[in-house]
Design a protein with these regions (language model features):
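M16 family metallopeptidases and their MPP-like homologs
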Residues: 76-79, 83-115, 122-171, 185, ...
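Bacterial N-terminal signal peptides
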Residues: 15-29
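His/Glu-rich zincin catalytic helix
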Residues: 33-130, 152-155, 165-167, 236-341, ...
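A short, acidic, amphipathic alpha-helical segment used as a generic capping/interface helix at domain edges
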Residues: 234, 449-455
Length: 501
């Protein structure tokens, strides 16, 4: 405790005798639905030295004050008074792209982005100027594949009531002006055309379609046709039917008083009425049972952009901690096997990685990177070699220990960000995790054994059923890819090219 009230000091055991308090400071919000599940790199990780001793790191995250408003809105409040700053995250279940009509890809994200473009009493310019004058930040989005729309805001606690009032206004009373909608759609059209020349986008698009098939998560962007179908009336209807308080979670962290704030929220959000939302969840994605190879042709490209992977687990799968450790060993950081092999030893690439998505439905594990065209053959060989190696050989004790300690150290560093701690609290609600999940997280990671790593590698990284996706010069790399299976070739617009020689 300190003179300003409750402290978020978290005591971390970093050695046998050394105890350090990590004080949480303000940072931009990181949203649970948008975060990558691979372990963040740190300076310590790049040096392959994790600053956590063999003692298991023990943390006890602050528990939020929780309330349910009369309209059904769940509110989570984390008080932190030393810094005069407040972070707000609002997750609106059922308003995400996962539920949008098949012919209107981008409806959810466009609706969310348009919240800032005008309310019943403010123009887009007035909203922007008022937020800037208050020194605040306000944004909204709905990621492809996500079941939620997310509104984020932050600013000083001294003028919290003012900037939160603007956020409430755009949430409850958007006008979706036609002229602003047309401007946004035109910007999206330009962006789509530009993305057709970006190998990273082409890879993501084809990889998602390869692993997700007919699942809505296969979409990574709107199409020109779907943008044409999105109208002001469609936005109004989506907002009216999907933005419901009983399916939403409002998280607030910072220099606020929970008791006083809950009473304010009850009044300020009283106009947000319940709406019956029908959430028809698509069937859970399943892993492919046979290997397929896909190639997006970029004539004269000097590099191959490569990914290989398959559907793995959802967030509640008990294999999650083992997957975190396995992924870290094979490709989760600069000390990983793929990085040391393909970059440090072979010099094939400046960066190579692996990660996995585990949300409320099963997502893919994937590995990949950008490679010089002439080393495509060697790189593919090494990708499969490393996958077979982690399946056939148990990870040595020292390597396993270093990986687990690095994961725990990165987790500890993330607790310095109040927005991140708020995201952890929201994640417990979103995924139905135990209340003490994050307190026990370091111990769960440290409990992962070499047998566990080998088991999940064998279970989810079957080389014979991985989906292989490459973007590059088909004339040069198609013969190489054919060694791994029949190659389906597409142009940059996604049109099949048939039996291109």
């Amino acid at each position: 405790m300190n003179g300003h009230g409750k402290s978020w000091d978290i005591w971390l055991t970093l050695g046998r005798c050394l105890v350090v308090a990590v004080t949480i400071v303000a940072a931009p919000p990181l949203l649970p639905g948008q975060e990558s599940l691979s372990t963040p790199q740190s300076k310590v990780e790049r040096k392959n030295k994790a600053p956590v001793s063999r003692e298991i790191l023990r943390v006890k995250l602050p528990k939020p004050v929780e309330a349910k408003l009369k309209n059904g809105l769940t509110v989570l409040i984390l008080e932190d008074h030393p810094a005069p700053f407040v972070n707000v995250q609002l997750h609106i279940g059922g308003a995400g792209a996962l539920f949008e009509p098949a012919n209107m890809a981008g409806l959810a994200s466009t609706t969310a982005h348009m919240l800032r473009e005008g309310s019943q009493t403010r123009t887009s310019i007035q909203i922007a100027e008022e937020i800037d004058r208050l020194g605040a930040a306000l944004s909204a989005g709905a990621s492809f594949g996500s079941p939620d729309a997310v509104l984020s805001a932050s600013g000083l606690s001294d003028n919290f009531d003012q900037w939160f009032s603007v956020a409430t206004d755009v949430l409850l009373h958007p006008s979706f002006p036609v002229e602003e909608l047309e401007k946004m759609k035109q910007r999206q059209r330009v962006q789509l055309r530009e993305q057709r020349s970006a190998p990273g986008f082409l890879l993501d698009e084809r990889f998602h379609r390869a692993v997700y098939g007919e699942h809505p998560a296969a979409n990574v962007a709107p199409t020109l046709a779907s943008l044409d179908a999105i109208s002001q009336a469609a936005l109004i209807q989506w907002h009216r039917e999907r933005y419901a308080p009983q399916d939403a979670i409002l998280g607030i962290a910072g220099d606020v008083r929970a008791k006083n704030l809950i009473a304010k929220l009850e009044k300020q959000l009283a106009g947000w009425k319940k709406t019956e939302v029908t959430e028809t969840w698509p069937r859970n994605p399943t892993a492919a049972t046979e290997r397929k190879v896909f190639l997006v042709d970029r004539p004269n490209s000097v590099q191959t952009t490569l990914a290989l992977g398959n559907i793995a687990i959802d967030r509640l799968n008990p294999d999650y901690p083992s997957m975190v450790v396995m992924n870290h060993v094979i490709g989760g950081g600069a000390s990983s096997r793929l990085f040391l092999n393909l970059r440090e030893e072979k010099g094939y690439t400046y960066g190579v990685y692996s990660d996995f998505s585990a949300l409320r439905y099963a997502g893919p594990w994937r590995a990949g990177g950008n490679l010089r065209t002439e080393v495509t053959q060697g790189a593919l060989t090494e990708f499969f070699n490393e996958i077979r190696r982690i399946q056939d050989e148990k990870v040595p004790a020292a390597e396993l220990e270093a990986s687990k300690r690095s994961i725990v150290a990165s987790f500890a560093l993330s607790l310095e960000q109040p927005a991140r701690v708020l995201s952890f609290a929201i994640a417990i609600k979103l995924y139905g995790l135990p209340a003490d999940y994050w307190d026990a997280y370091p111990a769960k990671i440290m409990a992962v054994s070499a047998d566990d790593v080998q088991r999940v590698a064998r279970k989810y990284l079957n080389p014979d059923s991985l989906q292989v996706v490459a973007v590059g010069d088909a004339d040069k790399i198609k013969p190489i890819l054919e060694q791994y299976g029949k190659v389906e070739v597409f142009d940059a617009n996604g049109v099949p090219l048939g039996a291109k020689p």
